[in-house]
């Protein structure tokens, strides 16, 4: 295998791990770093493919759980669910493009039992342009490896605080 293919497979795997439901690692530094090494399109496509696989896993795991919980409770759709139902594809795609956290919108898709194909398509439609932009930024702005490490550590702080911070009873 070529170094480029190995790099794409590594980015695919990392993108999967950084986008699966309860991910604890940031994806931005990896995409920025891979851009100049793998090329803009190769980076964006590998990262998007990993994201879509993570979306399939999330959907397969969480939609049945959420459906069972809602059936037990007998809860009517709330205001946010009704708002989401107006344009779910656009909302998911737009939230995937922005730097806003994606998980609240994913949760809305799960509670709405949004179909798998559309869900994955919406995430790909939002994430591909984001990854293209991040990969391009990695090519356009030559950043030293130490800065990528610092960015990764900085983005890990919220996760570390959640995992290892003080517990409130």
Question: Where are the predicted features?
Answer:
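Hydrophobic transmembrane alpha-helices of secondary-active solute transporters
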Residues: 14, 18-19, 126
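Hydrophobic transmembrane alpha-helices of multi-pass, membrane-embedded glycosylation machinery
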Residues: 30-35
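Short helix-coil transition sites and intra-membrane helix breaks within transmembrane domains
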Residues: 17-28, 95-103
């Amino acid at each position: 295998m070529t170094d480029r293919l190995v790099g794409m497979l590594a980015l695919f795997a990392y993108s999967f791990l950084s986008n699966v439901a309860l991910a604890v690692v940031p994806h931005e530094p990896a995409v920025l770093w891979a851009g100049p090494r793998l090329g803009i399109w190769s980076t964006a496509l590998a990262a998007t493919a990993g994201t879509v696989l993570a979306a399939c896993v999330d959907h397969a795991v969480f939609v049945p759980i959420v459906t069972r919980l809602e059936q037990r409770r007998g809860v009517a759709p709330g205001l946010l669910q009704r708002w989401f139902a107006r344009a779910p594809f656009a909302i998911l795609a737009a939230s995937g493009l922005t730097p806003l956290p994606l998980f609240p919108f994913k949760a809305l898709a799960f509670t709405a039992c949004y179909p798998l194909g559309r869900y994955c398509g919406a995430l790909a439609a939002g994430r591909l342009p984001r990854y293209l932009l991040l990969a391009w930024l990695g090519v356009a702005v030559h950043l030293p490896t130490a800065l990528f490490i610092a960015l990764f550590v900085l983005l890990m702080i919220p996760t570390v605080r959640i995992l290892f911070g003080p517990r409130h009873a």
